[in-house]
Amino acid sequence: MVALLCSASLCGDISVGDACLVSNIKAKCRDNLVTGGLKFHALKIGSRKKHWRRKSMRCSVVSMKSSDFSGSMIRKSSKPDLSSSEEVTRGLKSFPDTDSSFSYFKSVAGNLNLVHTTETCNYMLEALRVDGKLEEMAYVFDLMQKRIIKRDTNTYLTIFKSLSVKGGLKQAPYALRKMREFGFVLNAYSYNGLIHLLLKSRFCTEAMEVYRRMILEGFRPSLQTYSSLMVGLGKRRDIDSVMGLLKEMETLGLKPNVYTFTICIRVLGRAGKINEAYEILKRMDDEGCGPDVVTYTVLIDALCTARKLDCAKEVFEKMKTGRHKPDRVTYITLLDRFSDNRDLDSVKQFWSEMEKDGHVPDVVTFTILVDALCKAGNFGEAFDTLDVMRDQGILPNLHTYNTLICGLLRVHRLDDALELFGNMESLGVKPTAYTYIVFIDYYGKSGDSVSALETFEKMKTKGIAPNIVACNASLYSLAKAGRDREAKQIFYGLKDIGLVPDSVTYNMMMKCYSKVGEIDEAIKLLSEMMENGCEPDVIVVNSLINTLYKADRVDEAWKMFMRMKEMKLKPTVVTYNTLLAGLGKNGKIQEAIELFEGMVQKGCPPNTITFNTLFDCLCKNDEVTLALKMLFKMMDMGCVPDVFTYNTIIFGLVKNGQVKEAMCFFHQMKKLVYPDFVTLCTLLPGVVKASLIEDAYKIITNFLYNCADQPANLFWEDLIGSILAEAGIDNAVSFSERLVANGICRDGDSILVPIIRYSCKHNNVSGARTLFEKFTKDLGVQPKLPTYNLLIGGLLEADMIEIAQDVFLQVKSTGCIPDVATYNFLLDAYGKSGKIDELFELYKEMSTHECEANTITHNIVISGLVKAGNVDDALDLYYDLMSDRDFSPTACTYGPLIDGLSKSGRLYEAKQLFEGMLDYGCRPNCAIYNILINGFGKAGEADAACALFKRMVKEGVRPDLKTYSVLVDCLCMVGRVDEGLHYFKELKESGLNPDVVCYNLIINGLGKSHRLEEALVLFNEMKTSRGITPDLYTYNSLILNLGIAGMVEEAGKIYNEIQRAGLEPNVFTFNALIRGYSLSGKPEHAYAVYQTMVTGGFSPNTGTYEQLPNRA
């Protein structure tokens, strides 16, 4: 092969024609022209005429093989070409095979005027990797080390790929072992560089492993490497490792500098180890490495973070009097940190000092001042500060306005924040995604997911592309509200706007799925998260384990726990606490103890919550003795029991019947932890149940004596409620009487309320009335209106209307003014019992006593009128109320009216009223649709009923069991059994469980249509698959339809099954059997059934005689 070698530095005379003549030698070969290290194809010389005319060149023709490149063949240049890297790369790419490229690579390496770069070396490494040439790759890597060519991430990743090491840079510690085996031996510079690359990628653990290997191989890391490692470990709060590195560097003869010491102070300070930070500061002085202004600023920052504000001020004063004067960063740090601690006075003091020292306030410092004023609640001064800024020629920037908006939202001044937000553009500042995020976050945390989503959409319409933080903030609000549909739209729309979900995104979506019960979707998302290279954090997995346990998917929860190792996650104390709680809930004591012991062995020390969870498991499963043993172990392990610990063990002792032991434990508890309200509610019910009234009395009096304030009424209500639930009415009343009689409870009414409630709930309304009289008359308790209402409600529930009226009169006679709830109780009772006159009389009384009726009152009256058959009167009242603008109808207003009209055959009016609901801001609910569907169904208008069903689904109203039952019934009534069966299947597929009524309707419909095999299949399904016990209607329906179809033997079997089920047949049962036998031409069987019926004490009706053969 012939190549033309030219050098611009070697001047000679050559014409373009001569050059072209020379270039034609062996034109069929691949000729190369190298000019000052730049390569051109010989056939392209003509295109560079202008360049060649400017320069005279000396050239020589050299005959050689394509692989025979040597350094001597490339003429020396007096001046290296700065663009050589790009040209060398082009040269490497021009060769048809890797061997030629590698030869050219080595020849360039031998030329002193040409310099290989990271780009050329990486290209060569990749080309060699593709051909599997590891030895040559090792040569390239060694050259990079010797020539000190930067080894970047791509360098190492290419080598890792060639060695089949998967997992990226994170696998560096493992890859280094393989690299050495294949000749890639790192020097000190490479080790330092690799550690920096790992730290830059936040692989701190892996960086430390590489550091350890570096030390083992006898290399000494640089001071910069130690500093970088310390910074990385400091971010992870790994103080021991940071301080360990400080010692190690000294053993290797490296002397820490001011930067290294400052890093240590920052790490110690942020971890709250202020004394240790001061020791480092003292050591700096002792070793002649005096702290600089950065060191002092870092120390001030640490002291402020640890809330040691006085110490921070002392350091500041020391700086002022010393040689290291505070700089602008020092003042910004002081202003910012004291602002965070809401110390406005100090902020103003530092501001004054800053100005005295000649540091002119700028937009950054002014923004900090605005933040401090907002945190102090001085919003007027904060807004005035904006004017001061403008007067000084400093325009508030976006961060200033965002700070002010955040301050306003922090104190829930939403309207002011929105006003400022609306004025930003007129003030010359355009809101960014962050501004919108602030509002989205506020709405989300306030539970207003609608406004959060509207703000997110508004941001997009303004042309601001949402970032991942905005999406995550929106997802937070939607997840909190369980609005999975909108959350999915945002999540799956991320790709459309060029965003990639991060760990927070996935966490929010999994939370949302968990909230709506879509656990499988959450698990799928976890897999997707890992596939997309987004590593799940332990919080996400803990949440998922907890969700699975709550859904009783215990096995899957444990599988998720086992997968944590595969996900390279270390279980935390929260993980173990969740699993322990689950085991305790399922009564698996042994497994809980084993898990507890396992977590200790695996280096995850239990905390107080862990022990409390374990105690809860043991005490609920009658293992209180073991819990007491574990309590001693808890204290030995340095865990301090809290009030929850003692409450749990007291619960266990009381549950186990060890009331006296519980009392002793309670007295021991007081020496360490003061009991709380829960303690009393746990202990006293057991003490009272054991009839230890005197002991219970002493415990409560002692507790109240040590209380600073008298307990609220709710305290007594909850306490007596707990005692009633455990000890029963008699002992609870004895204890309560003692408390009231001795004035321990100053407001006896708060004790009377739970007693009345308990008695009424247990259907002992007369007893409630008696106790009410005893406490009010004998013990002098003055009942309040809520107590009267409770008693009146209980009496009316038990249909004791007259006594309730007496109590109502008593209310008025004692000076208590009945409220709307009192009247509503009585009005509802009158309406349900058909006492319309009394209802209207009381309704009028309300207005004369200035007790304003509410919507519930009006609804009760309307409902009462409808039930009494006075639909028109009810409509008149409705229209009168609608003329009053203060009345807002509800679904309970329309329900009785639509029902009354439907049952009266006035379906057109019912539909008209239904259509008018939305005009008054009342959206029809499922119950309203059910009433109307039932009305049309009963009238035989199945199409209208089906249309209403489709409409309710379209409008987002979820049908319930009643809806499907009504629809199935009306379709079967008109013979459209297939459609009825369709909706019955849809009912089951929707997750609803059909009841016996629904099964009866479809079985009867199939039977009437002579589809008896299908009817029997559903009959068996309800018994076996669904566990629903058929009632007499089910059996009667089957007997009747089987008999009509001539299947009298099967009908007889169903009759026998009635007897086995323990049900008593009625006249309709016998009539159905008689009819079946009569139609089948078996009169003797028909008369036999008739005889059985009469001898069984059943009275035949006209239907019986009509079915007997002699009447045929």
Curated annotation (Swiss-Prot):
Stored InterPro entries: Pentatricopeptide_rpt, PROP1-like_PPR_dom, TPR-like_helical_dom_sf
Family annotation (PROSITE patterns): PPR
Lineage top rank: taxon: Eukaryota
Keyword vocabulary terms for this entry: Chloroplast, Plastid, Repeat, Transit peptide
Main localization (coarse): plastid
PPR repeat positions: 117-151, 152-186, 187-221, 222-256, 257-291, 292-326, 327-361, 362-396, 397-431, 432-466, 467-501, 502-536, 537-571, 572-606, 607-641, 642-672, 676-711, 712-746, 748-783, 784-818, 819-853, 854-889, 890-924, 925-959, 960-994, 995-1030, 1031-1065, 1066-1100
UniProt keyword annotation of Repeat present: yes
Residue interval of the organelle targeting sequence: 1-62
Classification via Gene3D superfamilies: Tetratricopeptide repeat domain (1.25.40.10)
Keyword Plastid: yes
Subcellular location: Plastid, Chloroplast
GO CC annotation: chloroplast
Function text: Plays a role in the stabilization of the primary polycistronic transcript of the petL operon encoding subunits of the cytochrome b6-f complex.
Annotated PANTHER family: PENTATRICOPEPTIDE REPEAT-CONTAINING PROTEIN 4, MITOCHONDRIAL-RELATED, RESPIRATORY COMPLEX I CHAPERONE (CIA84), PUTATIVE (AFU_ORTHOLOGUE AFUA_2G06020)-RELATED
Sequence similarity: Belongs to the PPR family. P subfamily.
Stored NCBIfam families: PPR
Protein name per its UniProtKB record: Pentatricopeptide repeat-containing protein At4g31850, chloroplastic
